[in-house]
Curated annotation (Swiss-Prot):
Gene: metAS
Protein purpose: Transfers a succinyl group from succinyl-CoA to L-homoserine, forming succinyl-L-homoserine.
Family: Belongs to the MetA family.
Subunit (UniProt): Homodimer.
Catalytic activities: L-homoserine + succinyl-CoA = O-succinyl-L-homoserine + CoA
Cellular component terms (Gene Ontology): cytoplasm
Species name: Salmonella typhi
UniProt-annotated site: Important for substrate specificity, residues: S192
EC number(s) recorded for this UniProt protein: 2.3.1.46
Binding site for substrate: K163, S192, R249
Protein name: Homoserine O-succinyltransferase
Pathway as given in its UniProt record: Amino-acid biosynthesis; L-methionine biosynthesis via de novo pathway; O-succinyl-L-homoserine from L-homoserine: step 1/1
Single biological process term from Gene Ontology: L-methionine biosynthetic process from homoserine via O-succinyl-L-homoserine and cystathionine
Record's subcellular location: Cytoplasm
């Protein structure tokens, strides 16, 4: 799916160098079709890196996807130039009267922070409540999963003693589910989180359907039966070197982190890691766009009543 972005967005050249199909606004305006409108609430500190990762996964299908980037934290960023934020991000007030086909809420490095201590927690609640009436399907990633479970289901924050970091094996529970269509019976995906997602907790306190689990029994992929909300507790969007960057950052900070599991060849941090989850990540996002967004969203977004026959 060619993603439609502003011509000047840095991700355009970055992704083209990777042979990813990106359609700029100037080119897309000549095609007489309605693109899917997808809003990305980017909560990660390194916003440009995160943009590249998610746009890569949204790009591989014949339909257009019109991407809009959202920020809700008005504080000055230490990792992203203010000029970039001003040029390419909108504020919630700019879009609160609009409807969207899809919303992606990224992770955030807030695993050890209590929800009420998060500077933009009221804004997170506001966006999630707004999405119920203004978005066909919302996909939550990693920390955003924990936040959404608290806001939508009242589940308290669940925190691991040690950070889960590495590339883990998962297995699908419902091979005929739309979101896992085409998945291998088992697959690899990265995790980098303090948040804990026991499958039993999801089954006991929500009506969500778990579609894939880790080998240790943690819920990895789950969704509502009406396709309106979906959750992925890992980071299928990560680049090959993202976990390495986090590991060496923590080493330099004197945190004595564990070496990410099943990531560096021969468990040697000096070795170059390989991507073993790219196909899974691409298929997950393609399935979400197709079955959870495109197949149920109305042609006229003024009439939001998504259903799936």
């Amino acid at each position: 799916m060619p993603i439609r972005v502003l011509d000047e967005l840095p991700a355009v050249n970055f992704l083209r160098e990777e042979n990813v199909f990106v359609m700029t606004t100037s080119r897309a305006s000549g095609q007489e079709i309605r693109p899917l409108k997808v809003l990305i609430l980017n909560l990660m500190p390194k916003k440009i890196e995160t943009e590249n990762q998610f746009l890569r996964l949204l790009s591989n299908s014949p339909l257009q996807v019109d991407i809009q980037l959202l920020r809700i934290d008005a504080r000055e960023s230490r990792n992203t130039p203010a000029e970039h934020l001003n040029n390419f991000y909108c504020n919630f007030d700019d879009i609160c009267d609009q409807n969207f086909d899809g919303l992606i809420v990224t992770g955030a490095p807030l695993g050890l922070v209590e929800f009420n201590d998060v500077a933009y927690w009221p804004q997170i609640r506001q966006v999630l409540e707004w999405a119920k009436d203004h978005v066909t399907s919302t996909l939550f990633v990693c920390w955003a999963v924990q936040a959404a479970l608290n806001i939508l289901y009242g589940i308290p924050k669940q925190t691991r003693t040690d950070k889960l970091s590495g590339v883990y094996e998962h297995h699908i529970l419902h091979p005929h589910a739309l979101l896992t269509r085409g998945f291998d019976d088992s697959f690899l995906a990265p995790h980098s989180r303090y948040a804990d997602f026991p499958a039993a907790l999801i089954r006991d306190y929500t009506d969500l359907e778990i579609l894939a689990e880790t080998e240790e029994g943690d819920a990895y992929l789950f969704a509502s039966k009406d396709k309106r909300i979906a959750f992925v507790t890992g980071h299928p969007e990560y680049d090959a070197h993202t976990l390495a960057g986090e590991y060496f950052r923590d080493v330099e900070a004197g945190l004595n982190p564990e070496i990410p599991y099943n990531y560096f060849p021969k468990n040697d941090p000096q070795s170059i890691p390989r991507t073993t989850w790219r196909s899974h990540g691409n298929l997950l996002f393609t399935n979400w766009l197709n079955y959870y967004v495109y197949q149920i969203t109305p042609y006229d977004l003024r009439h939001m009543n998504p259903t799936l026959d």
